[in-house]
Curated annotation (Swiss-Prot):
InterPro entries: Ribosomal_bL32 (IPR002677), Ribosomal_bL32_bact (IPR044957), Ribosomal_zn-bd (IPR011332). Belongs to the bacterial ribosomal protein bL32 family. This is Large ribosomal subunit protein bL32. Residues 1-38 are annotated as: Disordered. GO terms for cellular component: large ribosomal subunit. Residues 7-16 have a biased composition (Basic residues). One of its GO terms (biological process) is translation. Disulfide bonds: none annotated. Gene3D superfamilies: Single helix bin. Keywords: Ribonucleoprotein, Ribosomal protein.
């Protein structure tokens, strides 16, 4: 089992963890239906940028 040779300081530990923060998803509202969706993704009704791109 691996055992550290020297103790890492709180500063080094926190600097390593600085990239671990979570970000919220970029959510947009559709122009036609008012439905929320992820940016650059088609809505559940098949609309993308105000145009119908998928017919069900």
């Amino acid at each position: 089992m691996a055992v550290q040779q020297n103790k890492k300081s709180r500063s080094r530990r926190d600097m390593r963890r600085s990239h671990d923060a979570l970000t919220t998803a970029a959510v947009s509202v559709d122009k036609t239906s008012g439905e929320t969706h992820l940016r650059h993704h088609v809505t559940a009704d098949g609309y993308y940028r105000g145009r119908k791109v998928i017919n069900k």
